[in-house]
């Protein structure tokens, strides 16, 4: 079991962290060689200081696993963690600490942080990936059957190891994988190796992944998410290029990775990680706090207006899964911070559900029943110009969502169930 690990960023050592087994806590210190580089990978709570040791015992154990937020952002989320736990079971290992998890990921994390020493998780050959097999193996890897792995042939074990490599670094709850994709040929390869010519890095959300046996039919989430991507673009909100890959009646949602540019890694921090705003504590934070973080990162006014546009969109289309991991920031090699492109911008509302019955972050002190006046008050307090025009445009464009949804082949019953919940008259 690993207790000490090194952190690298942009080809240079950032620091070292040690696991305190008694306190179940990591202690991080910046490398002396990193001090004076002019880079601040976590400037709000972990500014670069010589001799300063960072540890945080008062933040959520379930989310941060005893790590500082800067490092915890690299941990797998619900789906990735499930894959990792199944891989541990398959290989006869016990669940390790957070340091061991990061060493397993090594250079395969989202963003640009890399961890050493890397565990024995080989990248696998650069071969073409068949999506139908990926869906099947992902479903088997998530199976809760006790006999999982007991009688698997070596070929299937290797396939499951591959989906673990492709899926553990991706965040969120839905089944997904990190891939290299060639839009011209439609060919899919592993996203954990250097992308061949003509390929770029994408995240694919797999349609039809279940823990049940037999053919996995479409659940239409890919088509639904793609229809909202189209709506996001029409509202003038920045989002990475997205598309659908269809096979066997299923539609997998594909989004270009914004933490990779021209094959280079880009350092990324979520609002959760950079400010320790625990996304598992619903209705504990506000959009006002997000704007305060943006000011601390010295983001320009244009990005504040962009964030306001996203906030209004979330209200109008009832994206109430708007938690602190669904806002991210990017830092380039010169240390300049920017707001990342938007992601996970779709309908998420269940009046009977504990999570999405209300917004996760408040606006003008409210998590529910947010009005136009609340949006205008927010704009006034945060010096956002043209707020009325932004609200009007997003409401008007969103009224055309059913047309976009039908063009994306979203089933009519799904459209009919969603449409009455949109706040088009705000």
PLM features: what roles do these ranges have?
Residues 1-324, 328-426:
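Phosphate/dinucleotide-binding and metal-coordinating scaffold of catalytic cores
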